[in-house]
UniProtKB/Swiss-Prot annotation:
Interacts with the N-terminus of HTT and with the phosphorylated C-terminal domain of POLR2A. Interacts with AKAP8L, SF1, SRPK1, ENAH, ATBF1 and MECP2. Interacts through the WW domains with formin proline-rich regions and with WASL/N-WASP. It comes from Mus musculus (Mouse). Residues 140-173, 181-214 form the WW domain. The gene is Prpf40a. One of its GO terms (cellular component) is nuclear matrix. InterPro entries: FF_domain, FF_domain_sf, Prp40-like, WW_dom, WW_dom_sf. This is Pre-mRNA-processing factor 40 homolog A. Residues 803-824, 863-878 have a biased composition (Basic residues). Residues 389-443, 456-510, 523-583, 603-663, 668-723, 738-795 form the FF domain.
Length: 953
């Protein structure tokens, strides 16, 4: 082959191939025709043209087994339907290595395409069947080992009779070439839940609603193959004749080294081979037409546009097959070249990663044009005319550019390169030519500098990407170590040392940031993983220690299988464990709080139940304000609600009972008012002889008594009964006072009797003297009269005895006193004085004795009344416990009054003890003035006391 023909005839440029990313495999933009008769190096590009790989494999190298996905990858299988799960189909074996003769790819393609056109695109040959045998016709009727069957639910599955395996996916043996292309496409069509189709890329994990262009091209190519018949036999023979002239020159370009030859027997006729070749050309032309219909660019030598009809290539191959009808002798290198002529080439110009070689050029099938034909087809010399000087100058510059005159060339060097061209004479003057040449040099130098700058920039970017993506590069890698590793590589030496250092520093910063981010992500991932493991470990509690947790983690299979988790930072693991323990402690505390709340709720419900139990007792009349715990304990203790109260903190059952009774007592004043209103409405008055049953009968006769407490009713009854008793005592006191007044009047009557009553007098003897007296009539009972008379006689006798004793003492004193007196005084006068003094003493003594007796009686009566008051106060305090506050105030007032009364009584007694001396009467008469005064004072005092008692009540 001539150098440069691949770039000039529409093949893929080498620079374009190098600009493509090497990481892409044949699965991105192209699909292998596996299962067909094409060689393993044949590929169909996205635009439908048959292309070949530039690298030539060794005849003995191992090719990928036929029927397998390129690059050792299996085709993406659709989601397995529900129901029967078929076994996975293992990779199928390739053809035997002894069956790799150097057969021309054109004959193989012709046989394959002829079979496809005649059989209406039947499925490709099953894997394991040699394509050379099929081309020779030795196994033309070979039966596939896969059979098609129907499942009970109507779905189709496929069974392998040799491996005894079944699969839902259609095997490559039964697929047509178009179906194989579609199956190798990474884009698959699926249905959403709503039935709308969408497309998913199994390699990039991308999904979209619109149909990808790659899938559309493959479907268009499938339709082209199915349609068929685009090239007729006449067109095919015309192409064969046109190729015969260049047959010899093509053969010379195959290989210069002699290799062993192999004879291939032909079992097909020339017409069959021609028809097969026509089918191949038709398929390629239709695919190219479909690709050109999708693009708007014109056919050029770039990657985006490919020649529409590569007839010279195909016709030459077909002509070779027709001429060598009986036997064909081909060298080993030519076999390898022809095996690679039908390689599927992607529009991006990707190079197969299996070979690892970067060829210098990418040639298409059109590179087989003979050199002689190319020289003959060169155009003859033309004559140029220029209308203006600018056009002539532009033509001269184009000449320099076409001849690729460098920017540093001298004028003499440039003349040698362009002087033979007619456009050299475009400018007549030499100065104009030199001027145009200098302008061309400036422009070319500028363009070269710009191109060098862009290439250098691209080299720096490539170097930066190389360092960033290299697996051995880290943020701690030294520059010297990197120079040792990459110093011999072109990407390292493509830039200067200064720029290399700057880029290296930037790469280290980028890698450091990247590593930090990765470490952060790894730390976060390990944190989450450890947290999940701790959450799922039931034996880790809030009281678990770190050492115990470590042992639990080592026994955990999830932790033991995760190497990254085992390499986790110990401090991070400890912090994660600490947070987990804190969460468990918080949960435990919350659980305790919930338990405490539940316990408190239970205790509260127990208290409420016991309160309801007390209400029930109150409704039945068993519990009232006067009830005691000891009385009701047998009844209360027999209830379960009392048992539930035992042992719980807070208020006990006794406390609740006391509170309940106190509440009932607090209602006493209000209920007492209601009771008084009821008694007032009924006109009932509580007397001393009123019974509690009568009182309750009167109270319960109205509806207002339903809310009254039985204890409060009893307390009200006791209060009213005490008031009735107080009234009765007051009445008795009043009668006693009246009786005392009558007695004092009777005694006065006896004292004032004339003649005076003697000490030895008898009541029956003197009774008749007082019958008509009012004092005698006031006392109706004779027995009382006798009693008063006896008392009077007893007092009279006592006074007489006291008087005689005083007279004796007085006589002795008077004698002594009489001796001291003056003798001038007469004896008669002294006698009169003595008698007069004696009378006075007798009166004073009788008066003082009566006063003492009366004061003693009054004091005794006062003490009795005071004792009675104290007893009544005690009774009131015992019975009227709710009125304790008011009673205390009343007691204070009464005490104050009593103290005042005591003071007044003491003053009166002191007055009685020292009475004024009065002018007396005769000693023989009764002196009753002193006794009368004492009785009056006593009477006044009694009246004041009675008035005070009435006021208090």
């Amino acid at each position: 082959m001539r150098p440069g023909t691949g770039a000039e005839r529409g093949g893929l440029m080498v620079s374009e191939m190098e600009s493509q990313p090497p990481s892409r495999g044949p699965g991105d933009g192209e699909r292998r025709l596996s299962g067909s008769n094409l060689c393993s190096s044949s590929w169909v590009s996205a635009d439908g043209f048959l292309r070949r790989r530039p690298s030539m494999g060794h005849p003995g190298m191992h090719y990928a087994p036929m029927g397998m996905h390129p690059m050792g990858q299996r085709a993406n299988m659709p989601p397995v339907p529900h129901g029967m799960m078929p076994q996975m189909m293992p990779p199928m074996g390739g053809p035997p290595m002894g069956q790799m003769p150097g057969m021309m790819s054109s004959v193989m393609s012709g046989m394959m395409m002829s079979h496809m056109s005649q059989a209406s695109m039947q499925p490709a040959l099953p894997p394991g069947v040699n394509s050379m045998d099929v081309a020779a016709g030795a196994a033309s009727g070979a039966k596939s080992m896969w059979t098609e069957h129907k499942s009970p639910d109507g779905r189709t599955y496929y069974y392998n009779t040799e491996t005894k395996q079944s699969t839902w996916e259609k095997p490559d043996d039964l697929k047509t070439p178009a179906e194989q292309l579609l199956s190798k496409c990474p884009w698959k069509e699926y249905k959403s839940d709503s039935g709308k189709p969408y497309y998913y890329n199994s390699q990039t994990k991308e999904s979209r609603w619109a149909k990808p262009k790659e899938l559309e091209d493959l479907e268009g190519y499938q339709n082209t193959i199915v349609a068929g018949g685009l090239i007729t036999k006449s067109n095919l023979h015309a192409m064969i004749k046109a190729e015969e002239s260049s047959k010899q020159e093509e053969c010379t370009t195959a290989s210069t080294a002699p290799v062993p030859t192999t004879e291939i027997p032909t079992t097909m006729s020339t017409m069959a081979a021609a028809e097969a070749a026509a089918a191949v050309v038709a398929a390629a032309a239709a695919a190219a037409a479909a690709a050109n219909a999708n693009t708007s660019t014109t056919p050029t030598n770039t990657v985006g546009s490919v020649p529409v009809a590569p007839e010279p290539e195909v016709t030459s191959i077909v002509a070779t097959a027709v001429d060598n009808e009986n036997t064909v002798t081909v060298s080993t290198e030519e076999q390898a070249q022809l095996a690679n002529t039908t390689a599927i080439q992607d529009l991006s110009g990707d190079i197969s990663s299996n070979t690892g070689e970067e060829p210098a050029k990418q040639e298409t099938v059109s590179d087989f044009t003979p050199k002689k034909e190319e020289e003959e087809s060169q155009p003859a010399k033309k004559t140029y005319t220029w209308n203006t000087k600018e056009e002539a100058k532009q033509a001269f510059k184009e000449l320099l550019k076409e001849k690729r005159v460098p920017s540093n060339a001298s004028w003499e060097q440039a003349m040698k390169m362009i002087i033979n061209d007619p456009r050299y004479s475009a400018l007549a003057k030499l100065s104009e030519k030199k001027q145009a040449f200098n302008a061309y040099k400036v422009q070319t130098e500028k363009e070269e500098k710009e191109e060098a700058r862009s290439k250098y920039k691209e080299a720096k970017e490539s170097f930066q990407r190389f360092l960033e993506n290299h697996e051995k590069m880290t943020s701690t890698t030294r520059y010297k170590k990197a120079e040792q590793m990459f110093g011999e590589m072109e990407v390292w030496n493509a830039i200067s040392e200064r720029d290399r250092l700057e880029i290296y520093e930037d790469v280290l910063f980028f890698l450091s940031k990247k590593e930090k981010e990765q470490a952060k992500q790894l730390r976060k991932r390990n944190w989450e993983a450890l947290k999940n493991i701790l959450d799922n470990m039931a034996n880790v509690t809030y009281s678990t220690t770190w050492s115990e947790a470590q042992q639990y983690l080592m026994d955990n299979p999830t932790f033991a299988e995760d190497e990254e988790l085992q390499n986790m930072d110990k401090e991070d693991a400890l912090i994660c464990f600490e947070e987990h323990i804190r969460a468990l402690e918080k949960e435990e505390e919350e659980e305790k709080q919930k338990t405490l709340l539940r316990e408190r709720r239970r205790q509260r419900k127990n208290r409420e139940s016991f309160q309801i139990f007390l209400d029930e007792l109150h409704e039945h009349g068993q519990l009232h304000s006067m009830s005691s715990w000891m009385e009701l304990y047998p009844t209360i203790s027999s209830d379960i609600r009392f048992t539930n109260m035992l042992g719980q903190p807070g208020s006990t059952a006794l406390d609740l009972f006391k509170f309940y009774v106190e509440d009932l007592k607090a209602r006493y004043h209000d209920e007492k008012k209601i009771i008084k209103d009821i008694l007032k409405d009924k006109g009932f008055v509580v007397e001393v002889n009123t019974t509690f049953e009568d009182f309750v009968a009167i109270i319960s006769s109205t509806k207002r008594s339903t809310t009254l407490d039985a204890g409060n009713i009893k307390l009200a009854f006791n209060s009213l009964l005490e008031k009735a008793e107080a009234r009765e005592r007051e009445r008795e006191k009043e009668e006693a006072r009246k009786m005392k007044r009558k007695e004092s009047a009777f005694k006065s009557m006896l004292k004032q009797a004339t003649p005076p009553i003697e000490l030895d007098a008898v009541w029956e003897d003197i009774r008749e003297r007082f019958v008509k007296e009012p004092a005698f009539e006031d006392i109706t009972l004779e027995s009382e009269r006798k009693r008063i008379f006896k008392d009077f006689m007893h007092v009279l006798e006592h006074e007489c005895q006291h008087h005689h004793s005083k007279n004796k003492k007085h006589s002795k004193k008077s004698k002594k006193h009489h001796r001291k007196r003056s003798r001038s005084r007469s004896g008669s006068e002294s006698d009169d004085d003595d008698s007069h003094s004696k009378k006075k003493r007798q009166r004073s003594e009788s008066h003082s004795a009566s006063e003492r007796s009366s004061s003693a009686e009054s004091e005794r009566s006062y003490k009795k009344s005071k004792k009675h008051k104290k007893k009544s106060k005690k009774r009131r305090h015992k019975s009227d416990s709710p009125e304790s506050d008011t009673e205390r105030e009343k007691d204070k007032k009464e005490k104050d009054r009593d103290s005042e009364k005591d003071r007044s009584r003491q003053r009166s007694e002191s007055k009685h003890k020292s009475p004024k001396k009065k002018t007396g009467k005769d000693s023989g008469n009764w002196d009753t003035s002193g006794s009368e005064l004492s009785e009056g004072e006593l009477e006044k005092r009694r009246r004041t006391l009675l008035e005070q008692l009435d006021d208090d009540q």
